[in-house]
């Protein structure tokens, strides 16, 4: 029974209906044409791969901000946070992470703290790698206060192919670094907004691993001082 449960744990629940549908169509195709059946089973395997939900070894420290998503650090710049969160006209450091269709799309909490506000904003579906995607695309914005008293923002952004954002958070939730909180289907972007003068530990073009890569350190500790937990 445990192995059965573990099998479902490693696949995000958002993928169940897709995998079942792909598998059913594949069996139907195979009954008529072997080659079409093979194509269908390849598509089913890719669907399983896309919705994979692996455990990660999360660095544990109240001073850390970790990557909420797998992908490439597309851009680091000063920018205004989403206006719908009511943070005013004070710029923050924005770290943008672009996810292609081969990345893990499960999103994770970037720091220990409390969720202060959430806002869903319907929008367009520009290519998520473009800078204007942060402003115009469909997005789910989350404002949190870390256990160190820092306010940070993380935003799930739909892309050219992604057409569904899932966020399981509610205002008032107490959250821990590395916890899973949602998913974006089929190519997307996640922005993280941090206070100015935050000590960043990533650079543009770097590959980030959600739940593991340290984006920033408010305390500037040495890596040997961190503890890690599997989550």
UniProtKB/Swiss-Prot annotation:
Tell me a Gene Ontology molecular-function term this record carries.
phosphatidylserine decarboxylase activity
- How is the protein disposed in the membrane? Peripheral membrane protein
- Which pathway does the UniProt entry assign to this protein? Phospholipid metabolism; phosphatidylethanolamine biosynthesis; phosphatidylethanolamine from CDP-diacylglycerol: step 2/2
Positions marked as site (Cleavage (non-hydrolytic)): 187-188
- Amino-acid biosynthesis: present as a keyword of the record? no
Highest taxon, organism lineage: Bacteria
Q: How is it modified after translation?
A: Is synthesized initially as an inactive proenzyme. Formation of the active enzyme involves a self-maturation process in which the active site pyruvoyl group is generated from an internal serine residue via an autocatalytic post-translational modification. Two non-identical subunits are generated from the proenzyme in this reaction, and the pyruvate is formed at the N-terminus of the alpha chain, which is derived from the carboxyl end of the proenzyme.
Reaction(s) this enzyme catalyzes, per UniProt = a 1,2-diacyl-sn-glycero-3-phospho-L-serine + H(+) = a 1,2-diacyl-sn-glycero-3-phosphoethanolamine + CO2
Keywords, in A-Z order:
Cell membrane, Decarboxylase, Lipid biosynthesis, Lipid metabolism, Lyase, Membrane, Phospholipid biosynthesis, Phospholipid metabolism, Pyruvate, Zymogen
Active-site residues?
188
Q: What does this protein do?
A: Catalyzes the formation of phosphatidylethanolamine (PtdEtn) from phosphatidylserine (PtdSer).
What this protein is called in its record is: Phosphatidylserine decarboxylase proenzyme
Query: Which species?
Result: Rickettsia akari (strain Hartford)
High-level lineage = Bacteria, Pseudomonadati, Pseudomonadota, Alphaproteobacteria, Rickettsiales
């Amino acid at each position: 029974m445990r192995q059965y449960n573990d099998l479902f744990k490693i696949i995000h629940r958002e993928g169940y209906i897709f995998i079942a549908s792909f598998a059913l169509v594949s069996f139907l195709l195979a009954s008529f044409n072997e080659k079409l059946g093979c194509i269908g089973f390849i598509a089913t395997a890719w669907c399983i791969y896309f919705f994979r939900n692996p455990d990660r070894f999360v660095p544990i420290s109240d001073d850390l901000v970790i990557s909420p998503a797998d992908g490439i650090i597309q851009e680091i710049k000063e920018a205004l946070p989403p206006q719908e969160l009511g943070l005013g006209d004070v710029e923050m450091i924005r770290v943008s992470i672009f996810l292609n269709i081969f990345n893990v799309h499960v999103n994770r909490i970037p720091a220990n703290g409390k969720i202060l506000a959430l806002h869903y904003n319907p929008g367009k579906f520009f290519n998520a790698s473009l800078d204007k995607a942060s402003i115009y695309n469909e997005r789910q914005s989350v404002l949190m206060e870390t256990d160190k008293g820092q306010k940070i923002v993380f935003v799930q952004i739909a892309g050219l192919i992604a057409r569904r954002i899932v966020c399981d958070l509610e205002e008032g939730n107490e959250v821990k670094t590395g916890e899973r909180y949602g998913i974006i289907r089929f190519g997307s972007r996640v922005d993280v907004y941090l206070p100015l003068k935050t000590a960043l530990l990533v650079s543009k073009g770097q590959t980030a691993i959600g739940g593991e890569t340290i984006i920033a350190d408010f305390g500037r500790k040495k890596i040997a001082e961190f503890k890690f937990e599997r989550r």
